[in-house]
Amino acid sequence: MKRDLYETLGVKKNADEKELKSAFRKLAMKYHPDRNPGDQEAEKSFKEINEAYETLKDPQKRAAYDRYGHAAFEQGGMGAGFGNGFAGGSAGGFSDIFEDIFGEMMGGRQRRSSGGRERGADLRYNMEITLEEAYSGKTAQIRVPTSVTCDVCTGSGAKPGTSPKTCATCQGSGRIRAAQGFFSIERTCPTCGGRGQTITDPCTKCHGQGRVTEERTLSVNIPTGIEDGTRIRLSGEGEAGLRGGPAGDLYIFLSVKPHEFYQRDGADLYCSVPISMTTAALGGKFDVTTLDGTKSRVTVPEGTQAGKQFRLKGKGMPVLRSNQTGDLYIQIQIETPQKLTKRQRELLQEFEQISSKENNPQSTGFFSRMKDFFDTLSE
């Protein structure tokens, strides 16, 4: 028993033309024989969805099907006049949508130029650099294994003194058409593999491919201020094209190593610096080494608290392709003394005894406010 045509396309019986076309496009891409070589079930499904769409997209045929079902198109049936040839104007409509749907799928044909030339594949190279290198920029030498144009046949794939011949099967188009019922399907030519040419006497070095594998050394310019995850494109430095086709591109994917002291946020840098409790209380100075190798002095005022930030203007990262520079932020961490001697402990205890609320206004105020808060709740 034949399947319901609406069920075949996966649409409701009141589906409009737009819904029918969308469903057909999706299913045709899924079951097309070129995407399922040798799969008889897929080929059967492909024929069914084409038959369903061709029927339902035509208002007269759809009306007949809605009234009589499949009997409308059977010989001698109630709607036999509609037939199964789909001749006349309807064929053009199917051809248009067929080309529209499979134009993208036949992209391999579009990538090939005359003579079976194909563009080479793009390559990816992962490079890791230091934060210092991202700061100052550099020129790096990299070695990339890739396919390059054969120097014996100059990319033609044919033995010197000979040349490729136009494929007799497809007449150089790289595609052949095969009739299937009321429509024809375009396939890759099995003789030339879609190249449009055949090589009877291939080059002995590249074996007819027009390219060979080797390792190349390339120079890569890393600009100042480059960020983690940046992609650099080297046009034409990918794999050589097949049979004299254009080369692909090489993409350098950069990653910046984590730094031992600095964290980066855009063009700004951050550094946490531990200082002693006495330096925080009495004040002091210390030097930090910036990414350009110079030293910058940071002055710590008396009574500096943990988390205090000091901004060193213009000491951050260069902004890519500009004259601007970010800032460096120094965040203070106060280190609590450990492994105290007896004398140190005595001095700290004495200091605690002679301290007043004014010496620790934040902690005194905090505990006072906490006590008042909970006292209010208990009333």
Swiss-Prot record:
According to the record, cofactor stoichiometry and binding are noted as: Binds 2 Zn(2+) ions per monomer.
Which keywords are on file for this protein? Chaperone, Cytoplasm, DNA replication, Metal-binding, Repeat, Stress response, Zinc, Zinc-finger
Q: Which residues of this UniProt protein bind Zn(2+) 2? A: C167, C170, C189, C192
| Function recorded in the entry | Participates actively in the response to hyperosmotic and heat shock by preventing the aggregation of stress-denatured proteins and by disaggregating proteins, also in an autonomous, DnaK-independent fashion. Unfolded proteins bind initially to DnaJ; upon interaction with the DnaJ-bound protein, DnaK hydrolyzes its bound ATP, resulting in the formation of a stable complex. GrpE releases ADP from DnaK; ATP binding to DnaK triggers the release of the substrate protein, thus completing the reaction cycle.
Q: Which NCBIfam families match?
A: DnaJ_bact (TIGR02349), PRK10767.1 (NF008035)
Q: Where is the J domain?
A: 4-69
Which species is this record about?
Sinorhizobium fredii (strain NBRC 101917 / NGR234)
**Its quaternary structure?**
Homodimer.
- Mapped zinc finger ranges (CR-type): 137-215
The CXXCXGXG motif repeats extend over 150-157, 167-174, 189-196, 203-210
Q: Which PROSITE patterns match?
A: DNAJ_1 (PS00636), DNAJ_2 (PS50076), ZF_CR (PS51188)
Pfam families cross-referenced by the UniProt entry? DnaJ (PF00226), DnaJ_C (PF01556), DnaJ_CXXCXGXG (PF00684)
Cofactor(s) demanded? Zn(2+)
Similarity-based family: Belongs to the DnaJ family.
Protein known as: Chaperone protein DnaJ
Q: Which gene encodes it?
A: dnaJ
